[in-house]
């Protein structure tokens, strides 16, 4: 028996046409939400993104459908940052992100003399909702899901997490945490089953 709630609400920011009309050699998206937010301000055909880098398979698939190509993807922002330090052409990136985002990627890039131009593409609003006590486990797909869930609920359940970053957010509160082998929704569901 399963029920679904995101515990968060996403709202795209309006991004200046001046920013979106200029050419961007290296662009980074750490979530599908950021890509969707950009596409509310401009069509994919109008955007001049030379190399698109991203985190996550779902984000990669979405970008391929909208833009046609992804230069490289990794399953975590830290792994992507390490890749960019090693292999990216140029010394500057445009980083589309949400208002609640981890600093790992920009920190690693900046420490390695890569200029990061951050653009807040969307806002995440935590919208905690009370869950029935009999629920035994909760699936989390982002650290902000964990934070929002904890606003209205206790941590006496099993936390099923999409990846290590989300699991790290859960570790401070939950006793039992299970992490998907591959960071996909399907893998988290497999964990539960």
Q: Which residues does each predicted region cover?
A:
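Signature of uroporphyrinogen-III synthase
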Residues: 1-193
């Amino acid at each position: 028996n399963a029920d679904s709630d995101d515990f968060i609400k996403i709202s795209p920011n309006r991004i200046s046409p001046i920013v979106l009309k200029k050419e961007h050699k290296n662009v980074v998206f750490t979530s599908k939400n950021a890509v969707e937010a950009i596409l509310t301000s401009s069509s994919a055909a109008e955007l001049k993104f030379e190399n698109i880098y991203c985190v996550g398979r779902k984000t990669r698939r979405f970008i391929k459908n909208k833009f046609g190509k992804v230069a490289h993807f990794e399953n975590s922002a830290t792994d992507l940052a390490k890749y960019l330090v090693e292999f990216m052409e140029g010394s500057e990136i445009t980083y589309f992100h949400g208002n609640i985002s981890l600093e790992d990627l920009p920190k690693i890039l900046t420490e390695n003399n890569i200029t990061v131009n951050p653009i807040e593409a969307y806002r995440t609003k935590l919208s905690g909702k009370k869950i029935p006590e009999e629920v035994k486990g909760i699936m989390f797909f982002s650290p902000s899901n964990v934070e929002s869930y904890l606003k209205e609920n206790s941590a006496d359940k099993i936390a099923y997490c999409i990846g290590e970053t989300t699991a790290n957010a859960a570790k401070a509160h939950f006793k039992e945490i299970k992490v998907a082998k591959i960071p996909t929704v399907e893998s988290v569901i497999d964990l539960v089953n």
